Amino acid sequence: MVTQMKPTVEIEYCIRSAMDSYVLVLAASSGKNLVLAHRFSESFERKGMNAKIVDLTTLHWPVYTPELDGDRDKSPDTSELSSLILNSSALVVCAPEYNGVMPPALNNTIAWLSVESDDFRKLFNNRTVLLATHSGGGGAHCLMAMRHQFSFLGSNVIGRSMTLNKSKPFSQATMDDLIQRVLQ
């Protein structure tokens, strides 16, 4: 008679967490950066890693002001996005350059998460973050602003980033290299 052994709780947890593991890709525009977010998602999937995309422009959260802080009737429900970030293995942020900085959709999202999340620091502290931009201009200022923001929040921002613009076309080799850096 063969006895079938039931996996231990730890093994079940490891199997479940590996299957549920994902990279969260945030798109801070509904145009070319959303297309870039989808390219990242597809590339992660080809490497065997699940990816989820959130288009921040569809959140329709009000512009954060201190007057709205704590007003339950006007504050957005950040719990779903907080949960997605908290449970992700890494973040990829795709954002265009707006007037030399990151776009309002990203800045507003971070502002609301900072006041509405149960533990804001837990969302970003020690989290791997990859930055990417598809910008009409160079995109360097947006990347610097995002790097500063996420570093301030305690994230581990990957040194290399992806920049697409009129003089820098998409490179799958660059994307593959960046994905490997996230998966390490």
PLM feature spans:
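N-terminal beta1-alpha1 ligand-phosphate binding loop
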Residues: 20-47
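Glycine-rich phosphate/pyrophosphate-binding loop and the adjoining helix
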Residues: 22, 152, 156-184
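Cofactor-binding loop segments of dinucleotide-utilizing enzymes, especially the Rossmann-like FAD-
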Residues: 28-30, 56, 134-136
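A generic structural motif
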Residues: 47-52, 155
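A structural preference for short, hydrophobic beta-strand core positions in alpha/beta folds
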Residues: 53-55, 159
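N-terminal beta-loop-helix "entrance" segment that forms/cooperates
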Residues: 57-73
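Helix-loop-strand module that forms the ligand-binding subsite of alpha/beta enzymes
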Residues: 73-153
